[in-house]
């Protein structure tokens, strides 16, 4: 085992990560157990409550297992049909979009407790208001960050990586589109979790996710481009969004027409218009190279037009 550590630094790196995470978790547990009376471990017999918790946790696990399976198997498919460079491009695209999506995730994290609290207090009108508006503003926030990156992606990648793997920019652009769908799903998922009856929505969304790998395999078998894999994922994410909206309508009374207009049609119309205006504006002004000032200018133009549209809407 020790010889493996000397010969393969990657194994040593993995072991050290496990040790660090385990030690960190143990220290958290020890501190909380000593300082906080309410966090001490004790065994209490609440059979019905335990059963309900296990049921909800089980459905949540079922909904997330397909995602983990897809991540691993898609990497395997890309390695089977293409060179490792394509897999490297996929890794870069996931890294970039995860960083971009973090901004909208922070907003949704702050809204999540309010959605759950509103349902618990039977304030369903406020809960639906929060779901729709957090979806809309998540799109806007993600858009402000994404637009400058989207417009000068090749230049940014060349500055960052110098030698950019083939397909990287295509993968990132398609994955960014999927990020908008993912940020729309989160408030809906919180609303469904709040009411507790998550069996059917999580079952069908999990089933939809399971179709990603077989469909991708068929496309690659017929020698389609690797970008097809990402397009399939986006289409499935759209299907999952439809499933979430449908069950939110049934279980928590979300108006489909109101949601489609306020969280989809209107925000994305604004996004399309502002993208066009930003492109036309920046094509007529002098902005040096690919640096900070270009990104700042694009973000400023986007933010200004978003504020104008929201003021008119109010």
PLM region spans:
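Membrane-interface junctions at transmembrane-helix termini in multi-pass inner-membrane proteins
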Residues: 1, 6-7, 11, 32, ...
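Helix-terminus/linker motif at the lipid-water interface of multi-pass membrane proteins
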Residues: 2-6, 68-99, 117-118, 151-164, ...
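Alpha-helical transmembrane segments of multi-pass membrane transport and lipid-handling proteins
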Residues: 128-183, 210-221, 272, 276-279
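Helix-loop junctions and terminal segments of transmembrane helices
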Residues: 36-37, 93, 97-135, 142, ...
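Conserved small/polar residues in nucleotide/adenosyl-binding loops
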Residues: 304-311
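Hydrophobic alpha-helical transmembrane segments
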Residues: 1-34, 56, 206-211, 225-247, ...
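Interfacial/gating helices of multi-pass transporter permease domains
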Residues: 10-15, 49-56, 77-98, 125-130, ...
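Interhelical loop/hinge segments that connect adjacent transmembrane helices in multipass membrane
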Residues: 6-14, 28-72, 110, 114, ...
